[in-house]
């Protein structure tokens, strides 16, 4: 009998950023204006020198401008913009250089703290540089000495932006045109971590010295209930608590509140900075040891080790009057304090699935908030 072999998973496919889409479409539109050449595909050079060809959905003259569009292909990454139509409209200007405008579906910056000034279209520096380099090279090749007005838009971008961090960052009216390498890596954490850093930067630049970093919607609701904290000071960290703690070394605040589900906080207590199940797991034997430190007898400790979930362990401790939630938060607090600067006051909240506080540490509040 032939021995069975496990089927190897197909490699995940990379995609291209909205910045690459904007570069390709602006180049095609400018070429049409300057040479009359209508393209159905265009080749661009990414920041690290790789050449890629991108297919266009359209490339046409309209009155005194040209426009081109392409469908964003994020590869196998679950990107909110995958399949969206990214388009550029280019007009020629007398003055040399490139001027950027936010079109329909692209946001504008309304708060200080980002790399772009207030009032600027949300087209990030690397995409701006990519477009500028391609357009100036085209102008040189064709002997054109004037400049370009480049309007970038994303069809349906205003609605898509509501699924991103843009509204909280003060980027209103649509999406951001992003990318540092020009390539979307499947399931890369880089973009999410960047949004966490931006959230902290925006909050501190706008004068907020107390921020609350939360793992999800329920923990955000808890922080609103406890502190009436505004959205600008709520940092949606998801599983990336390490991104918050490490960034505070560069941008310290006066006070940091960490809030998450009990299971997530127990991982932080064990020293994990990525709380996703792919990278860290709940240590039930460790929970049993912490329960012992707060009065759990041998039988309860064994039942914790044998529990199916951390929530089950927490419930057993609650029945026995053992404050496991507070003990876990104390260990999470100690770990967080070991990462951030000493001047940052840290507190930790653990919540249940209903948003009730089941543990807290470093908190100058009474239990009335639970």
UniProtKB/Swiss-Prot annotation:
Keyword S-adenosyl-L-methionine appears in the UniProt entry: yes
Pfam families: CbiD (PF01888)
Xref: Gene3D superfamilies: CbiD-like (3.30.2110.10)
One of the GO BP terms on file: methylation
Alphabetically ordered keywords of this record: Cobalamin biosynthesis, Methyltransferase, S-adenosyl-L-methionine, Transferase
Enzyme class: transferase
Reaction(s) catalysed (UniProt annotation): Co-precorrin-5B + S-adenosyl-L-methionine = Co-precorrin-6A + S-adenosyl-L-homocysteine
InterPro entries the record matches: CbiD (IPR002748), CbiD_sf (IPR036074)
Listed NCBIfam families: cbiD, PRK00075.1-1
Protein name: Cobalt-precorrin-5B C(1)-methyltransferase
GO molecular function: cobalt-precorrin-5B C1-methyltransferase activity
Family label: Belongs to the CbiD family.
Protein EC: 2.1.1.195
Associated pathway: Cofactor biosynthesis; adenosylcobalamin biosynthesis; cob(II)yrinate a,c-diamide from sirohydrochlorin (anaerobic route): step 6/10
